[in-house]
């Protein structure tokens, strides 16, 4: 099945503590989750590794968020949008449902 949300897409969070925030998708996981830049930040306690010269401490990093809790952001309308598929010149492409504009 083709993915509606892909890496480097700009998405907007629909639910949760980061509702309304926008970010770029860094990674799409096979478990139905995505990692979005600057969204769902968690604090991870990291142990020092002297052999690698790696300091310990508390590190903030992005945690995965369910793909159903994000929607692709349509810059033309300034809102979240739904994604559809169609064939153009024999290739399957994604498009915004609201204005039928092809997604990069």
Curated annotation (Swiss-Prot):
<dbReference type="InterPro" id="IPR003256">
    <property type="entry name" value="Ribosomal_uL24"/>
</dbReference>
<keyword id="KW-0687">Ribonucleoprotein</keyword>
<comment type="similarity">
    <text>Belongs to the universal ribosomal protein uL24 family.</text>
</comment>
<keyword id="KW-0689">Ribosomal protein</keyword>
<comment type="function">
    <text>One of the proteins that surrounds the polypeptide exit tunnel on the outside of the subunit.</text>
</comment>
<comment type="function">
    <text>One of two assembly initiator proteins, it binds directly to the 5'-end of the 23S rRNA, where it nucleates assembly of the 50S subunit.</text>
</comment>
<dbReference type="InterPro" id="IPR041988">
    <property type="entry name" value="Ribosomal_uL24_KOW"/>
</dbReference>
<dbReference type="GO" id="GO:0005840">
    <property type="term" value="C:ribosome"/>
</dbReference>
<dbReference type="InterPro" id="IPR005825">
    <property type="entry name" value="Ribosomal_uL24_CS"/>
</dbReference>
<dbReference type="GO" id="GO:1990904">
    <property type="term" value="C:ribonucleoprotein complex"/>
</dbReference>
<keyword id="KW-0699">rRNA-binding</keyword>
<dbReference type="GO" id="GO:0019843">
    <property type="term" value="F:rRNA binding"/>
</dbReference>
<keyword id="KW-0694">RNA-binding</keyword>
<dbReference type="Pfam" id="PF00467">
    <property type="entry name" value="KOW"/>
</dbReference>
<comment type="subunit">
    <text>Part of the 50S ribosomal subunit.</text>
</comment>
<dbReference type="GO" id="GO:0003735">
    <property type="term" value="F:structural constituent of ribosome"/>
</dbReference>
<dbReference type="InterPro" id="IPR005824">
    <property type="entry name" value="KOW"/>
</dbReference>
<dbReference type="Pfam" id="PF17136">
    <property type="entry name" value="ribosomal_L24"/>
</dbReference>
<dbReference type="InterPro" id="IPR008991">
    <property type="entry name" value="Translation_prot_SH3-like_sf"/>
</dbReference>
<dbReference type="GO" id="GO:0005829">
    <property type="term" value="C:cytosol"/>
</dbReference>
<dbReference type="InterPro" id="IPR014722">
    <property type="entry name" value="Rib_uL2_dom2"/>
</dbReference>
<protein>
    <recommendedName>
        <fullName>Large ribosomal subunit protein uL24</fullName>
    </recommendedName>
</protein>
<dbReference type="GO" id="GO:0006412">
    <property type="term" value="P:translation"/>
</dbReference>
